[in-house]
Amino acid sequence: VDTFDVLRGKGCKNNNGVVEKQVHGYDTWERESLKNEENPAPQYNLTEKKILRKYVGGDECDTEIAFEGRLVGGCMDCLGNLTGTSFDKVKEFNERYAADGIIWFLESCDLNVFAIRRAMWQMDNAGWFKNVKGFLIGRPLCYGQEMMGLDQYRAVTGIAAKYNVPVIMDCDFGHLSPSMPIVSGAYTQVKVKDNDLSLNYRFC
């Protein structure tokens, strides 16, 4: 799916007055980009097979998963710095969309696994995860890193597990391409079957 098509509304359907658009993840991703000064816009170097990791309550599972809610999130490198500041309006957002519930999409760039855990702890203790219906976690730039027994998965599930909601990891967004079009603020229906992630956006 082309992100520009999503932004222009191409391929959307009207369902009883509500505009909807469904997007799917990809089969492969790139660990190392071929981008350089001579070739600033190369094709994706798709060398890795996508394998979604699914957790509920801290336990990994392999069942079909579905949940829905209002989608919000971003890069933890930035969000962690905003937590608890005058720019932190998450409490108001949570209250406004309490009936919908919240789906958090999160990814990281420069953070190592311990910094990811700290960012999750900060957001949790600030009340950001109130009304959470599920987590979508993109591939971190530190993919595959392990430090003192902590890896990218436990860095997240160690905090998210207590909410007993689905945590889908290694999703197709973040700093390791390709990325699914993410529409922050959209009401989103999430389905995970086998190794396929689909997001159905409802613009309402």
Segments from the language model and where they lie:
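Oxyanion-binding "anion nests"
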Residues: 58-60, 70-109, 113
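Generic secondary-structure signature for well-ordered alpha-helical cores
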Residues: 1-12, 20, 81-88, 125, ...
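Fold-independent oxyanion-binding glycine-rich loops
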Residues: 3-9, 22, 26, 74-75, ...
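Conserved anion/nucleotide-ligand pocket segment
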Residues: 1-77
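C-terminal active-site/capping subdomain that shapes the small-molecule cofactor and substrate pocket
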Residues: 111-204
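A generic structural signal for short, non-catalytic loop/turn and secondary-structure boundary residues
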Residues: 65, 71-72, 97-99, 130, ...
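Short acidic (Asp/Glu) and glycine-rich catalytic loops that position anionic groups and cofactors
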Residues: 51-60, 99, 134-139
